[in-house]
């Protein structure tokens, strides 16, 4: 029997056109272990999917459950005739992209920002969504752009801007990727920097927003809305371009962190200093805003939050170092959701949390102690024991983020150091 390599692009032996038009109703009540894997927070209320989407979710859930494609499900090289007859429409030859839970292979890129390092603490690291660029902001009012590429070995610096007497606390990418907007707790206005024209613009909130320093703000994914956290337990929602005041959200306490839901420009998730979580919907013109509130499990003082790209997971951090990971669906639908799991490796206040694009990997850090940076394998609910390396030192990590496809992770530190790691399992930027 002749041998040949199995080709992934081969077509199934038959194709039923009725399968393409089939609509599948996703059950509203499923087991906890399957709920996150099959349902999406962006699904319509009736929960109907086309067959291709449903099959894709089943396959993804299976691979996550079993830590990859099991040996019996992988095709081996065999007879051409035999292979063409036995192959089914299920597409079992999909590439295994699941992250192993035992060890993670990373490389620290040495001297990433050599020649362009400041001594002021780095407060924000952001990867551009469509261009291989890392954006770094610090308490000296500096915004720097670096090229992210395996081909670039030396000078990765692209450009920078400095805002005098404007220590940056928050930064968001705006204008559909063309600009960044920065805020400072010492100033009552925002600064916008156009990365293409290098123009700098001062953005003043309207008079309906109290004049106060802006430590914290967020921008929706479509750059339509901008939310500013006030000092009086309020969130002020503005049009990002006109700065028109749209609505005000009242909170049980001051906000520690705010984020727009990744795919819903009118939905804001907030963690309060006292541990309450508020999910607020801005509402359409002429309608009232609505909100849903619950208390983070075991939290006394909330510090930060993160939402996975598809909203399947929601993570919170507290001053005790505990990170709770919830199902996004549970948070929406329950007034007392229970975490899927929690991570207790940090013993000091959590400063930042980030999910990679497919939510297989979560990074958590604290800027109170050296080397308080951990990587979590989400499916197995465990941390990688080989990260960070014993001989490596990450000083007082304040902020962390993954590149769009997970190939890189950036960590900003209080002493101005910038650490950029290659995550070898994910080869793309």
Swiss-Prot record:
SMART domains associated with the record: WD40
Listed GO biological process terms: rRNA processing
Superkingdom of this protein's organism: Eukaryota
A GO-annotated cellular component: small-subunit processome
UniProt KW Signal keyword: no
Keyword terms of this UniProt record: Nucleus, Repeat, rRNA processing, WD repeat
Ubl conjugation in keyword set: no
Localization terms from the record: Nucleus, Nucleolus
PANTHER family, per database record: U3 SMALL NUCLEOLAR RNA-ASSOCIATED PROTEIN 18 HOMOLOG, WD-REPEAT PROTEIN-RELATED
Name of this chain's protein: U3 small nucleolar RNA-associated protein 18 homolog
Organism: Caenorhabditis elegans
């Amino acid at each position: 029997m002749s041998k040949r390599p199995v080709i992934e692009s081969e077509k199934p032996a038959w194709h039923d056109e009725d399968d393409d038009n089939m609509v599948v109703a996703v059950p509203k009540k499923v087991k906890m272990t399957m709920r996150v894997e099959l349902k999406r927070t962006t699904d319509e209320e009736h929960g109907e999917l086309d067959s291709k989407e449903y099959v894709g979710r089943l396959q993804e859930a299976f691979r996550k459950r079993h830590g990859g494609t099991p040996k019996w499900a992988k095709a081996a090289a065999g007879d051409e005739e035999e292979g063409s007859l036995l192959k089914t429409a299920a597409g079992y030859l999909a590439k295994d992209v699941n992250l192993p839970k035992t060890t993670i292979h990373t490389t620290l890129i040495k001297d990433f920002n050599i020649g362009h390092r400041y001594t002021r603490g780095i407060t924000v690291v952001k990867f551009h969504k469509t261009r291989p660029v890392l954006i770094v902001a610090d308490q000296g009012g500096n915004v720097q752009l670096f090229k992210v590429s395996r081909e670039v070995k030396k000078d990765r610096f692209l450009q920078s801007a400095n805002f005098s007497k404007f220590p940056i606390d928050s930064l968001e990418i705006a204008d559909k990727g063309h600009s960044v907007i920065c805020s400072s707790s010492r100033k009552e206005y925002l600064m916008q920097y156009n990365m293409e024209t290098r123009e700098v613009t001062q953005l003043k909130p309207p008079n309906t927003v109290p004049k106060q320093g802006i430590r914290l703000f967020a921008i929706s994914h479509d750059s339509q809305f901008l939310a500013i956290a006030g000092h009086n337990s309020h969130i002020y929602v503005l049009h990002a371009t006109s700065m028109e005041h749209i609505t005000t959200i009242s909170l049980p306490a001051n906000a520690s962190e705010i984020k727009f839901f990744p795919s819903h420009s009118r939905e804001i998730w907030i963690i309060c200093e006292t541990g309450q979580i508020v999910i607020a919907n801005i509402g359409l013109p002429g309608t009232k805003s609505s909100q849903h509130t619950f208390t983070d499990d075991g939290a006394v003082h909330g510090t930060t939050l993160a939402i996975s790209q598809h909203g399947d997971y929601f993570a919170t951090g507290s001053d005790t170092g505990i990170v709770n990971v919830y199902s996004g669906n549970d948070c929406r639908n329950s007034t007392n959701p229970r975490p899927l799991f929690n991570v207790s490796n940090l013993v000091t206040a959590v400063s930042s949390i980030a999910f990679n694009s497919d939510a297989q990997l979560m990074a958590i850090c604290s800027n109170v102690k050296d080397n308080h940076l951990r990587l979590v394998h989400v499916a197995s609910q465990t941390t990688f024991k080989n990260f960070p390396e014993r001989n490596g030192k990450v000083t007082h990590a304040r902020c962390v983020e993954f590149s769009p496809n997970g190939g890189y992770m950036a960590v900003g530190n209080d002493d101005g150091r910038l650490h950029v790691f290659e995550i070898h399992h994910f080869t793309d930027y």
